[in-house]
Amino acid sequence: MLNTCVILCVDDEAAALALRCLVLSSAGYEVLTAADGAAALEIFRSIQVDLVITDYRLPRLTGTQLAAEMKRLKPAVPIVLFSGLVEEPLGSEHTDLVMTKGMPPVEFLQKVGKLIQK
């Protein structure tokens, strides 16, 4: 079954971004990518996305700063924050879900699916 949902993935680590894109596109999602917060905001403003998945550590803006600005622009779009930290990062109240890096792909896709269905 093909999903018609568009997901914006933001990460400055090319390998992590490529892996996330592979998992999501294999599940039928259309995936857009950005390597930093400024590029992500440009895409977010110009294209309708159904979900944003961002890393916490990004150049120029943190993932939580990016999430806060995105929620200000389009509050209904769910935002997932990826973090290598065990505890939730400061500012994560602007996100709908915090996931730790290294989550198994099946669990990752289940959580993404639940957020998109809301």
Listing of model-derived features with the role each one plays in the protein:
Residues 1-6, 104-118:
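Non-catalytic signal-transmission and effector/linker regions of two-component phosphorelay proteins
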Residues 36, 62-65:
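Acidic catalytic/metal-coordinating carboxylates
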Residues 58:
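Receiver (REC) domain active-site loop signature in two-component systems and cognate sites
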Residues 55:
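Active-site residues of response regulator receiver
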Residues 42, 64-75:
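Short amphipathic alpha-helix used as the core "switch/output" element in two-component signaling
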Residues 4-15, 20-24, 52:
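Conserved acidic segment of CheY-like receiver
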Residues 33-51:
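Acidic, metal-coordinating helix/loop segments flanking the phosphotransfer/catalytic sites
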